[in-house]
A protein has these predicted regions:
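C-terminal luminal/periplasmic domains and tails of membrane-associated envelope-modifying transferases
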Residues: 1-154
Length: 154
């Protein structure tokens, strides 16, 4: 069993505790999983990190979910900024890696939006603006209706 899979197991078990109504035990398991197998030892991946973020949100520990989400997001931003500096053939060689990192950041972005994490969205919006993303393409946390949804009259 790889260390990454072991970390995923903590999140799976924690979610089961949430479904059973024991959020305290779920948070304890999530904390233990990150303590025993921290991101400094096991690099962030969507598979071994998103379940922890979701678990914290589901268990009623949004601050812990936000902290982990932003830590992973900052890690992705560093990679993205690094790969954006590559030019020519080197740039071509890292294109798929850059796309993968952007997709991971997008998943975090949409998770934050889905969970209604306004402060996190605001921070991620600031970063997306540095990449040249237009304002109308961003999710605005202060608006009750996203720009890509339709209001149906009653």
């Amino acid at each position: 069993l790889s260390a990454s899979k072991a970390r995923e197991s903590f999140a799976r078990a924690a979610k089961e505790y949430v479904f059973r109504g024991d959020s305290t035990q779920a948070i304890r398991l999530l904390d233990m999983g990150l303590e025993k197998l921290p991101p400094q030892q096991i690099r962030y991946t969507d598979a071994n990190t998103l379940p922890f973020i979701e678990g914290y949100y589901m268990a009623g520990a949004p601050d812990k979910g936000d902290g982990l989400l932003m830590s992973y997001a900052r890690n992705l931003m560093q990679y993205i900024d690094y790969y954006l500096d590559f030019q020519g053939i080197q740039g071509d060689m890292v294109t798929q890696t850059l796309i993968d990192k952007m997709q991971s950041l997008d998943r975090l972005y949409y998770l934050a939006a889905y969970m209604g994490r306004q402060d996190v969205l605001a921070q991620l919006n600031d970063y997306y603006r540095t990449l040249g993303i237009y304002e109308n393409e961003l999710i605005h946390p202060d608006l009750s209706t996203p720009s890509d949804s339709v209001q149906i009259p009653e």
